[in-house]
Amino acid sequence: MTYNEDLKREIPTGWKVETLFKNSLTKLIKTGIPTFEGEKIYLPTACISEDRITDTTTKITYENRESRANMMPIPNSVWFAKMKNTNKHLYFGDYSQDRIKQIILSTGMCGLECPDYALEYLWNFIQNKQFEDTKDVLASGAIQPAINNNDLNSIWVLVPDISVLKMYSQRVKPLLEMKYNNEEENFKLEKLRDFLLPMLMNGQIKVG
């Protein structure tokens, strides 16, 4: 074990302490989305509760989207809400392609791209209460306090040895993938509901 001045505690020898803004595991995802045809589901932060998508009814086109609908999820990325006192997190693994193709996120979310072997570790990191507490302390602004990219320089990340990260990923990835698959089934059922409900209300289809 080695004492680390930044964390004020001992850490395993060979592990590193870096900032969330600049570290060997993540890359900040920039705003901007490619053009797309048809409609996509827009997820403002209000449609996310903790780590669950709660509302998929807001549809946008590339031309009619609001300015905040400008973040594109990518495989192997974790996301958290920037605003103070908002416990909202999302992750996208290499198995999340179907969902990624369908949704656009708000600029109220901060996205971090990471290697596949570090996704589960970083997901655990941003879900930790200590991370949320630190985020809330750093948040600034008179009306809607939130953190900005520079604030990420003040959030420390403990970076384990790559062999530890791979071992952790090997054990946790199947659980997250199972969770995602269950959510995706619900996601598809919600889309079917949203498609059929107007037809039912208009008398285009009948039940029974």
Please provide the spans of the model-predicted regions:
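Non-catalytic DNA-recognition/assembly elements of restriction-modification systems
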Residues: 1-32, 158, 162-208
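Proline-centric
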Residues: 109-119, 147-178
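Alpha-helix initiation and N-capping motif
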Residues: 17, 36, 119, 131, ...
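Sequence-specific dsDNA recognition surfaces
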Residues: 5, 21-33, 43-81, 92-94, ...
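Short coil/turn segments at secondary-structure boundaries
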Residues: 1, 33-41, 137-139
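A short beta-sheet element
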Residues: 69-131, 136-149
